[in-house]
Amino acid sequence: MRPPALLALFSCSAAFALMSEEIKEKVTPSQDLRQSSLPGRHDIDLKEIVFVIQSQSNSFHAKRAEQLKKNILKQAANLTQDLPRVLLLHQLAKQEGAWTILPLLPHFSVTYSKNSAWIFFCEEETRLQIPRLLDTLRRYDPSKEWFLGKALYDEESTIIHHYAFSENPTVFKYPDFAAGWALSIPLVNKLAKRLKSEALKSDFTIDLKHEIALYIWDKGGGPALTPVPEFCTEDVDPRCVTTFHSFLPLCGVPVKKEEIFVAVKTCKKFHADRIPIVKKTWAAQASLIEYYSDYAETAIPTVDLGIPNTDRGHCGKTFAILEKFLNHSHNKISWLVIVDDDTLISISRLRHLLSCYDSSDPVFLGERYGYGLGTGGYSYVTGGGGMVFSREAIRRLLVSSCRCYSNDAPDDMVLGMCFSGLGVPVTHSPLFHQARPVDYPKDYLAHQIPVSFHKHWHIDPVKVYLTWLAPSEEDQATQETQKDPREEL
């Protein structure tokens, strides 16, 4: 049975390009935003909400965020002359870790605490009904500490959350960013004070929404997430003030298979059990694919790069792949994808996704993690879900002096450090996954059209591929019906 997001692809993909039309709110100018006489309602103005769009600097994502900003302000202008502030996250600070939000809370506290009641966060594809949002926030006393959102929870303990709450993982709730989430100013002030007195302790940022919820909860010293039923990802209830439709971006014609080179990292001990899974599932979708190993086996065939296998890291092997691609492949091959031999990926969906990016730009794309972002550090694309490079990104990397400090260094982290030093940002896509489908909440995956998953551990990888990633009629319908979202920007 197909996941809900796949079943909705035909209708939702078309909706992706029509966001500005669908978001329009039917309101009358006579609606009074300054009065709230109902019992239990709190008198706040629209101008007391600071909107923060969790945007990215890549041109495609920045334009989508700018479009949402214009829509929010347009809705607001229909209601009041005192417009709210709408901020784009990637413009707020030059620091690498701005996307993790917590380092920005002291700035929010100093800048907005006197004249604001709420900081409302959302993603670039979140759709907002501004009058209803204001009405919803008026239910909560802005003088108290509130952490509001659509609640997600783990059905079983998972590695991406360090097996937190292993006895009963369902007890801890964290927000689905796609539905929007909000912090009251008193809570922002409290968190800002704490951040000034004690540094962020975690070295790694893996799942930001879970980690923010943990930090706010503070082992019971702070508020837990308050679920808000009006914060939605699917438009299933007339009360919804936010929605987030499933989408697989398509900006014109999908990238040709011949423009994508796929490099599979493997080693001799996995030739017999992992490579057959690759060939049985997604390999046929790739026009250009090679298997890079520590041992040349003609039956597969594998390519021996002359780099000894290591139990961890694989940095030497990855840089050898990058150099081989840049120096020995045709210039018309615009994209390199590096995956593990236990990565499950949809090349057809990747072709759709890459149509939204300019291969002449330095693009480094995948699921974004962070290391040491509270104290400098850098972002990186986690390798298991697949790392996507434009040719230009690889060229800039290899003309620099940044290289592995050892063959067994963690390749994805070294790449992140190198690209950070070069000023090439990681472009995040939540459609890539470092873990298995069972490691994510069902509600979270329900509004995705996934591109990849990772690991064969305790699953049937062929079944997972057929359920979540195999080409389908819905994917073909996307090509036939979806408009180029860039046309409206």
From Swiss-Prot:
What is the name of this protein? Beta-1,3-glucosyltransferase
Motif mapping: Prevents secretion from ER = 486-489
Q: In what way does this protein cross or attach to the membrane? A: Single-pass type II membrane protein
Sorted alphabetically, which PROSITE patterns does this protein's record hold? ER_TARGET
Q: Would you say which domain of life the source belongs to?
A: Eukaryota
Lumenal side, ranges: 23-489
Spell out the InterPro entries in the cross-references.
Answer: Fringe-like_glycosylTrfase (IPR003378), Nucleotide-diphossugar_trans (IPR029044)
Transmembrane stretches, start-end: 2-22
Cell compartments where the protein resides: Endoplasmic reticulum membrane
* The gene coding this protein: B3glct
**Which is one Gene Ontology cellular component term of this protein?**
endoplasmic reticulum membrane
| GO process terms (BP) | brain development; camera-type eye development; cilium assembly; cilium organization; cranial skeletal system development; fucose metabolic process; gene expression; limb development
Q: Which Pfam families match?
A: Fringe
**Which molecular function term from Gene Ontology is one that the record holds?**
glycosyltransferase activity
The signal peptide, as residue positions, is none
Matches recorded under PANTHER family: FRINGE-RELATED
Q: What class of enzyme is it?
A: transferase
Species the sequence originates in: Mus musculus
Instruction: List the carbohydrate attachment sites.
Output: N78
* Predominant localisation class: endoplasmic reticulum
Per the UniProt topology annotation, the Cytoplasmic ranges are 1
Known role: O-glucosyltransferase that transfers glucose toward fucose with a beta-1,3 linkage. Specifically glucosylates O-linked fucosylglycan on TSP type-1 domains of proteins, thereby contributing to elongation of O-fucosylglycan.
Recorded family membership: Belongs to the glycosyltransferase 31 family.
Annotated keywords: Carbohydrate metabolism, Endoplasmic reticulum, Fucose metabolism, Glycoprotein, Glycosyltransferase, Membrane, Signal-anchor, Transferase, Transmembrane, Transmembrane helix
Give the pathway: Protein modification; protein glycosylation
